[in-house]
Design a protein with these regions (language model features):
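P-loop NTPase switch/communication element
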Residues: 1-18, 25-27, 119
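P-loop NTPase motor-domain active sites and their immediate coupling elements
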Residues: 24-231
């Protein structure tokens, strides 16, 4: 689904489709957020806008930092591969990244409790539910039923911060041809210039954290085998 945006000229890195590398990308985002807060502390500012304004005033445009939007198209794929790392990264970003100019959009077509965990949900206060198959799915997303009664085609329930109950609103239903025209327009504004250092970090994640990300129980299994003295 992100094949067209991949050429849109606005990406920091190519679209990441490998769940293992996506987990590493989230880890990079957490590290980037932490680094930005260090920059803010050094300059005695609180957020990205203040930092960038100061850098421009100091005639240091090369130190201006861009805003970053992190989009997870299917959370279930990541939670199958590295649930603990992904959950931790999402929670840290959701808690702290906004002031650093980093924003997180998480989507899934399988809103079960093992995908949208209680910890993730607690740290993402603003949520949207499109049409779902059951009241259970609606409650998993919004904490209330109702999304199972939506009509589709952009019909949604929006639960923003500060509202006691979800708002029913209509979002645009954009066809593939419309998407292609939008991407074509954005592409004409400039070609993508990827950050190779970020690409390299994602392509070769630290083995201590992600080298065996496909099996989180590897260490437990090794310990069990050593204890039983047989495999």
């Amino acid at each position: 689904e992100f094949a067209l945006p991949a050429i849109a000229g606005i990406l920091l890195v190519p679209v990441v489709t490998d769940p293992k590398k996506a987990a590493a990308a989230l880890n990079w985002a957490v590290n980037e957020m932490t680094q930005r807060y260090k920059f803010f502390a050094e300059e005695s500012v609180k957020d990205l806008d203040s930092y960038n304004e100061l850098m421009r005033a100091n005639q240091e445009p090369d130190k201006v930092l861009p805003k970053i939007v992190i989009i997870i198209d299917e959370l279930a794929d990541l939670m199958m591969v590295a649930p603990s790392q992904v959950e931790e990264s999402i929670c840290r970003l959701a808690q702290l990244a906004r002031a650093a100019g980093m924003h997180l959009i998480v989507a899934t077509q399988r809103p079960s409790v093992d995908v949208v965990t209680g910890l993730i949900k607690a740290n993402i206060p603003s949520r949207i539910a499109f049409s779902v198959s059951s009241q259970v799915d609606s409650r998993t997303i919004l904490d209330v039923g109702g999304a199972e009664k939506l009509l589709g085609k952009g019909d949604m329930l929006y639960s923003p911060v500060g509202e006691n109950k979800p708002l029913r609103i209509q979002g645009p239903y954009i066809s593939d041809s419309e998407t292609a025209r939008i991407i074509d327009f954005v592409k004409k504004q400039g070609e993508s210039t990827y950050d190779e250092s970020v690409v390299q970090t994602i392509e070769t994640p630290e083995k201590s954290q992600y080298g065996e990300v496909s099996d989180e129980l590897t260490e437990d299994a090794i310990a069990f085998i050593l204890k039983q003295k047989k495999a």
